[in-house]
């Protein structure tokens, strides 16, 4: 009888242990071709239901040696390079990331990243590179949208039209 309760307790606790794993996320968003603007602008509610990346979660990037090689002389322009730690769970919210001066509801670089745990981390990402007019109005957007499976500990390259993204996840 006690073994049955122990087994039930272990089954009940097992998903919770797996559900709150802490990961270090690092990404480099860069341009590798002439901007290819999307037919639609970034939506005003681009970060809907996403949790903003908190300053206290940010970490010093470890892939600076790679970002340093993405130079204009080589045909690249680094747009965003961030590193942070976050818990990853099945029902956790997406993380909203942005960079630059805010213009109404938008930033020059903005996006969301959602991670789901597993041997291969299911990752949904959407990033916009926005261009603004003289009065701060949104004129055009480039968009990178991907759903990929990532292997923790492996640097992954995502190619999309005029933009590219390098992302690495490490379990802490």
Question: What is the predicted role of each segment?
Answer:
Residues 154-160, 166-168:
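Short, exposed beta-strand-loop hairpins at the edges of beta-sheets
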Residues 1, 59-65, 164-166:
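Contiguous hydrophobic segments
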Residues 2-8:
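Sec-dependent signal peptide recognition
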Residues 19-149, 156-158:
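Extended, low-hydrophobicity segments enriched in charged/polar residues
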Residues 24, 163-164:
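Short, surface-exposed beta-edge/turn micro-motifs
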Residues 32, 168-172:
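Short beta-strand-to-coil "C-cap" segments at the C-terminal boundary of structured domains/repeats
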């Amino acid at each position: 009888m006690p073994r049955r309760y122990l087994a039930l307790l272990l089954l009940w606790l097992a998903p919770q242990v797996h559900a709150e794993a802490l990961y270090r996320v690092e990404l480099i968003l860069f341009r590798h071709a002439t901007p290819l603007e999307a037919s639609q602008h970034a939506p005003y509610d681009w970060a809907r239901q996403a949790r903003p990346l908190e300053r206290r979660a940010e970490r010093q990037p470890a892939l600076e040696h790679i970002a340093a090689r993405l130079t204009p002389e080589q045909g690249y322009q680094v747009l965003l390079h961030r590193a942070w730690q976050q818990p990853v769970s099945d029902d956790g919210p997406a993380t909203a990331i942005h960079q630059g001066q805010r213009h109404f509801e938008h930033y020059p670089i903005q996006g969301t990243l959602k991670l789901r745990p597993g041997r291969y981390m299911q990752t949904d990402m959407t990033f916009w590179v926005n261009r603004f007019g003289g009065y701060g109005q949104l004129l055009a957007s480039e968009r990178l949208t991907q759903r990929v499976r990532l292997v923790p500990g492996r640097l992954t390259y995502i190619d999309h039209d005029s933009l590219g993204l390098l992302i690495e996840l490490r379990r802490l």
